[in-house]
């Protein structure tokens, strides 16, 4: 499958080249932070990303919410940026693994869309079409993922890691919890703003920061830069010094994006807003994360088909999440959209997706394990 279309030859890029891929989630803006952070630590990140579909978001859409950012570049320009800056994120061209689209059409009519081996080959054929030296896979598990159970996620991770290693790529999978939205935002501009603030300050939502450091340290360790703990310490240092934010600014500039939006995130248009209020008092015991993803889709933040247009301002601020206490009438979420007529359906979906109870339930750890 990897040989069915264009191969992406990265041999002109000097140094260890590593890619990071997520199987999809809600609020998953890790690539926006991990890619420049890993580059600031010394590895080359040549990342080819996809668009969002259904309730999950895509890195390409998020980057395109930065005015001017070009996600389609000639490969030689892509290589030049990686050599000069250390990181570049582009979109996948139509002729990379074209047979995958044909195979997916067959899966769609043969009830094999959920087949783990076929999911694994679809993902890994695209990764193997590029000449990276290492691959870090973020395999999400839970209500906001396509992998609803730990067993399914672990099996998928094992298949993909085995494929990568057999092809001569250093490959590791990080199993992550998606039983609540990742971070405090869902949607394109909203997630970019949250990622920028983390890059600027080294501070943010604790689960998002923990996962960013886990993924980055896995990338550095694959590159032979030390064990996980020493690599994590290096990543923390590069966040605190602002070097990772500078890498992000340099990358956006080379992609012709407007860097002034990164320096002053108030320039992002975030639509009109509506607060969603807690219907009763208690602890947030559970969130149907897919429901939150669909609620953001209803606001215009995603697409049902690849031809749909996206409202970059649309999305949800997650004000309260699992394990937090609310009083009746407290704000639990803030909806964003350019079209206020979309609020009613989205608000209803958010309220349907949240359970409030009397007992404090601790959320799952965000990192569930590793497969190597």
Regions found by a protein language model. Give the residues of each.
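Well-ordered secondary-structure scaffolds
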Residues: 8-9, 17, 112-115, 119, ...
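Acidic, glycine-rich active-site loops and adjacent beta-strand->loop/helix elements
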Residues: 22-24, 51-55, 66, 141-143, ...
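Phosphate/diphosphate-binding glycine-rich loops and adjacent basic-rich segments that engage nucleotide
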Residues: 83-132
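Short glycine/serine/threonine-rich phosphate/pyrophosphate-binding segments
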Residues: 26-34, 39-40, 47-48, 55-57, ...
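A glycine-rich helix N-cap at a beta->alpha junction
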Residues: 62-88, 158-164, 168
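Active-site cofactor/substrate anionic-group-binding motifs, chiefly glycine-
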Residues: 1-49, 53
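General beta-strand structural signal in soluble alpha/beta enzymes
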Residues: 45-49, 71-74, 89-92, 136-139, ...
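Glycine-rich tight-turn/loop motif centered on a GG-T
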Residues: 62-72, 106-113, 146-150
């Amino acid at each position: 499958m990897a040989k069915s279309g264009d191969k992406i030859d990265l041999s002109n890029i000097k140094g260890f080249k590593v890619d990071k891929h997520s199987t999809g989630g809600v609020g998953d803006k890790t690539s926006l932070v991990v890619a420049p952070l890993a580059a600031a630590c010394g590895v080359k990140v040549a990342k080819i990303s996809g668009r969002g579909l259904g309730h999950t978001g895509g890195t390409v859409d998020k980057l395109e919410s930065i005015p001017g950012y070009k996600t389609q570049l000639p490969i030689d320009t892509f290589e030049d940026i990686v050599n000069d800056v250390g990181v570049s994120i582009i979109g996948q061209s139509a002729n990379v693994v074209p047979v995958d689209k044909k195979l997916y059409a067959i899966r769609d009519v043969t009830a094999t869309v959920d087949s783990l081996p076929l999911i694994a080959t679809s993902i890994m054929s695209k990764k193997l079409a590029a000449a990276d030296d290492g691959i870090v896979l973020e395999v999400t598990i839970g209500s906001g993922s396509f992998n609803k159970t730990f067993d399914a996620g672990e099996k998928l991770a094992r298949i993909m890691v085995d494929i990568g290693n057999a092809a001569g790529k250093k490959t590791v999978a990080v199993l992550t919890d998606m039983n609540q939205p990742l971070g405090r935002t869902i949607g394109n501009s909203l997630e970019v703003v949250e990622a920028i603030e983390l890059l600027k300050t080294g501070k943010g939502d604790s689960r998002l920061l923990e996962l960013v450091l886990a993924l980055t340290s896995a990338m550095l360790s694959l590159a032979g830069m030390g064990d996980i703990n020493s690599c994590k310490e290096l990543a923390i240092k590069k966040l605190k010094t602002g070097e990772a934010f500078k890498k992000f600014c340099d990358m956006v500039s080379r992609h012709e994006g407007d860097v002034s939006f990164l320096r002053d995130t108030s320039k992002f248009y975030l639509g009109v807003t509506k607060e969603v209020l807690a219907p009763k008092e208690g602890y947030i015991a559970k969130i149907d994360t897919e429901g939150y993803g669909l609620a953001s889709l209803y606001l215009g933040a995603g697409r049902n088909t690849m031809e749909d247009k996206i409202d970059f301002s649309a999305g949800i601020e997650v004000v309260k999440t699992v394990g937090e206490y609310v009083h009746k009438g407290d704000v639990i979420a803030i909806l964003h959209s350019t079209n206020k007529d979309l609020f009613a359906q989205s608000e209803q979906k958010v309220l349907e997706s949240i359970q409030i109870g009397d007992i404090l339930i601790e959320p799952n750890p965000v990192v569930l394990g590793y497969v190597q």
